[in-house]
């Protein structure tokens, strides 16, 4: 990656009270309690997006909603609207700490549900806990794990003998109960800070474990379970799972979905519509599990992101049918690779206005196999993606 291509790394994620400026206005991230929106909240968010922003809504890789294109002079009014909907914390510190990803398949009263409620309350009150902006918790206590590929620093899962608290990347952990899991998770977060895990306010658990021993009490075997079956649009026991094209939908689609049930947010850029069995076609929705767009990830790109060096989504849409079944294409506007931080089979990283590097089996920042591929050339000969592989 050339020095000119190096993107700016902020080290924190936007929130509602601490938004981030992008190329299309403010990005305001909404962390819905329990990762769930009631129909009233979903309609309210759609109205706020249209009134104060671009009318585009993203779902992030940590199961949060992002309102895009919010005008700076409308931010205060937006926050008032979010407060009325019960979708904003008391202060930016509490909002930043409450970085929880919850399995969308929780049931009312089950372990995941109880722990998520307790942990959210504990984090709001832990004013001394100055965690890095990207530090997060995953609660995945169902019989089959579904969040193993979701970024998190502290994980609460179901092990062979019950619930277990595990530092990300560790193959051992601390047995817990649903009652004490939240408190032990906070203790592990404090251990992370005490061990110097956040120099200059940044750092992740995986990096700390690579250079230090784990907590002395975390000795119970906790082999890292393989990720459960890849999630696709379709029927589940809890409702209908629907995907969003590149993780984005117009606010009108969000409002229309609310007519069919409460919405659960997922880290797969999908929504779970509680109790639904059928949905009409709506702009931005993918209902077919074989849709080739599911084999492609693409960030906002230019001009929506000031760090993107090229437009991304039109090209991603055009190339999707050429991505082989079972493979994934990540099209990134810069080397940060926000849309798909993990390695992908095929990666196109923008290096100039109409120029991309091709990387195979890597991330957007890895060394390219081919350079200076134009968007027109890729459209004309999409087999360039897999040629010689």
Residue ranges and their predicted role:
Residues 74, 197-229:
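Terminal amphipathic helices with adjacent charged low-complexity linkers/tails
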Residues 125-127, 360-361, 366-389:
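Short flanking/linker segments adjacent to small metal-binding domains or redox-active Cys/His motifs
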Residues 169-200:
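Internal alpha/beta scaffold segment
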């Amino acid at each position: 990656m050339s020095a000119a291509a190096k993107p700016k790394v902020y080290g924190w994620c936007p929130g509602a009270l601490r938004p981030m400026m992008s190329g299309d206005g403010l990005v305001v991230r909404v962390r819905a309690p329990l990762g769930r929106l009631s129909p009233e909240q979903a309609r309210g968010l759609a109205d706020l997006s249209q009134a104060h922003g671009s009318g585009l809504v993203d779902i992030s890789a940590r199961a949060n909603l992002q309102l895009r294109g919010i005008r700076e002079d409308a931010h205060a009014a937006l926050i008032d609207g979010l407060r009325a909907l019960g979708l904003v914390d008391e202060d930016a510190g509490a909002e930043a700490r409450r970085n929880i990803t919850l399995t969308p398949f929780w049931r009312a009263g089950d372990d995941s549900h109880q722990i998520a409620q307790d942990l959210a309350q504990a984090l709001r009150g832990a004013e001394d806990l100055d965690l890095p902006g990207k530090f997060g918790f995953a609660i995945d206590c169902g019989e089959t794990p579904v969040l193993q590929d979701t970024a998190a620093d502290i994980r609460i899962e179901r092990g062979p003998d019950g619930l277990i608290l595990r530092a990300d990347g560790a193959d051992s952990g601390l047995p817990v109960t649903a009652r004490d899991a939240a408190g032990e998770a906070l203790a592990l977060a404090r251990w992370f800070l005490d061990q110097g895990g956040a120099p200059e306010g940044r750092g992740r658990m995986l990096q700390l474990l690579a250079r230090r021993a784990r907590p002395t009490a975390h000795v119970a075997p906790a082999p890292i379970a393989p990720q459960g079956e890849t999630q696709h649009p379709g029927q589940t026991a809890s409702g209908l799972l629907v995907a969003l094209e590149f993780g984005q939908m117009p606010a009108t689609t969000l409002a229309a979905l609310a007519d069919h049930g409460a919405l659960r947010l997922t880290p797969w850029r999908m929504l779970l519509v509680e109790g639904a069995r059928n949905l009409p076609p709506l702009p931005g929705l993918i209902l077919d599990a074989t849709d080739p767009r599911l084999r492609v990830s693409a960030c906002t790109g230019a001009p929506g992101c000031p760090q993107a060096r090229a437009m991304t989504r039109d090209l991603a849409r055009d190339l999707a049918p050429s991505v082989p079944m079972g493979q994934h294409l990540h099209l990134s506007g810069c080397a940060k690779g926000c849309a798909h931080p993990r390695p992908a089979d095929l990666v196109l990283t923008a290096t100039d206005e109409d120029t991309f590097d091709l990387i195979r089996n890597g991330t957007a920042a890895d060394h390219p196999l081919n350079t200076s591929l134009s968007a027109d050339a890729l459209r004309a000969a999409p087999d360039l993606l897999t040629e010689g592989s």
